[in-house]
Regions:
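ATP-binding N-terminal substructure of ATP-dependent carboxylate-amine bond-forming enzymes
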Residues: 1-74
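A short beta-strand motif that forms the metal-chelation/ATP-contact edge
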Residues: 116-118, 162, 227-237
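Active-site nucleotide/adenylate-binding loops and adjacent lid/helix of ATP-dependent enzymes
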Residues: 78-154, 164-168, 194-201, 328
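Peripheral (often C-terminal) accessory segments that flank ATP-dependent C-N-forming ligase machineries
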Residues: 258-332
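ATP-dependent carboxylate/phosphate-activation module, predominantly the ATP-grasp catalytic core
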Residues: 150-211, 235-258
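A short glycine-rich, hydrophobically flanked beta-strand micro-motif that places a catalytic Asp/Glu
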Residues: 213-225
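Short glycine-/acidic-enriched loop or helix-start segments at secondary-structure transitions
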Residues: 3-4, 60-63, 126-128, 158, ...
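Structural motif
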Residues: 48-49, 174, 230
Length: 332
């Protein structure tokens, strides 16, 4: 929806159609003239531009077409190596970039718990979280489809979004993700601008080695024990917080769609829909961040946003406070 919003705001005469893959929920929105189910290649023929957004659709496009273009940027099938978490961790380790200790089965784990588990091959969504005991690990569904990693303490995830051509990064933007949904690691809720030369150097080293062409987000955690950033993964797709990058760096939309606009200097933002999804206990805890954010990002009109508060149990006084804050800050 971030791309659609910017196309309609700054583009000239774009007609947008949404799409979803079989098995995915259909998302209707006023941004789209129509929404269709993409069952085969014929569903996307005849369009000037087809831009997959999630992991499932990006993988499908790369497998069906091998390479596809969005304006002057090619996305190559070879990028799917980044979806294979054990392989990309091994490659990055060989480049001299710090990585977490990673295990492909529970029996191989030889480090103190907790460990972080996630999909072995990126499929979008899926189980992820912390396990503090082997009994907890054994209760996980589809254990053979997961990897288990050394837990790097700390809530902050550092990201560098980029567009690259043949291994050269042509534009990028760094951020720090201070709050995620789910809490243990997921999509950004509270995010701030950030810059560190080591993150730039590590990401450039990885992208060069991959000869990466396309777009993605490299993610890191900071390890106090190592006194260094630890590579976590590359999301070789559009990332959940990309609108924050659009706000601060107009080169992303210029390269992808030939659209130019003046970027703003937005220091921080909260994604309201995900903030609400955290539940009221976490919302109470992070009210200061809500009040201090430079920008609120949400993808529904204000009426439906406020109605969403009634779907979760929130103390009346807190609900009234949050509603007032959102209404007062509308349009920022």
């Amino acid at each position: 929806l971030a791309v659609a919003r910017y196309l309609l705001k700054y583009g000239n005469g774009y007609v947008l159609h949404g799409g979803f893959m079989p098995g995915e929920a259909m998302t209707k929105h006023s941004y789209y003239e129509k929404v269709l189910c993409v069952k085969d290649k014929s569903a996307v023929s005849g369009y000037d531009i087809v831009l997959p957004t999630g992991a499932k659709s990006t993988r499908w496009m790369a497998e069906q077409f091998g390479e596809f273009r969005v304006n002057d940027i090619s996305y190559c099938k070879e990028n799917l190596l980044c979806f294979d978490k054990p392989r990309i961790i091994s490659l990055v380790k060989d480049l001299g970039v710090p990585v977490p200790k990673t295990f492909e089965n529970i029996g191989a784990i030889d480090i103190p718990l907790p460990v972080f588990y996630k999909q072995k091959f990126e499929e979008g969504g899926g189980p992820r979280g912390l396990a503090s005991s082997f009994a907890q690990l054994e209760q996980l569904q589809s254990k053979e489809r997961l990897i288990y990693q050394e837990y790097i303490p700390g809530a902050i995830t550092y990201g560098m979004g980029f567009i690259a051509k043949s291994g050269d990064i042509i534009t990028s933007f760094q951020h720090e993700e201070l709050l995620s949904y789910p809490i243990q690691g997921g999509s950004a809720v509270y995010i701030r601008t950030f810059w560190d030369e080591r993150i730039r150097e590590y990401t450039e080293r990885i992208i060069k080695a991959l000869q990466f062409s396309g777009w993605g987000l490299a993610e890191y955690k900071y390890c106090l024990k190592r006194q260094d950033y630890v590579f976590m993964e590359i999301n070789a797709k559009l990332w959940a917080s990309i609108e924050f990058a659009f706000m601060n760096n107009s080169d992303f939309m210029r390269h992808l769609f030939g659209i130019d606009y003046i970027a703003n200097n937005v220091k921080s933002a909260i994604f309201i829909n995900r903030f609400i999804a955290l539940g009221w206990r976490q919302m109470v805890r992070y009210v200061p961040q809500l009040l201090n954010a430079s920008k609120y990002i949400y993808y529904h009109n204000s009426g439906s946003l406020i109605r969403s508060f009634t779907s979760i149990t929130i103390p009346h006084k807190l609900k009234r406070l949050l509603k007032n804050v959102l209404l007062q800050r509308r349009g920022l």
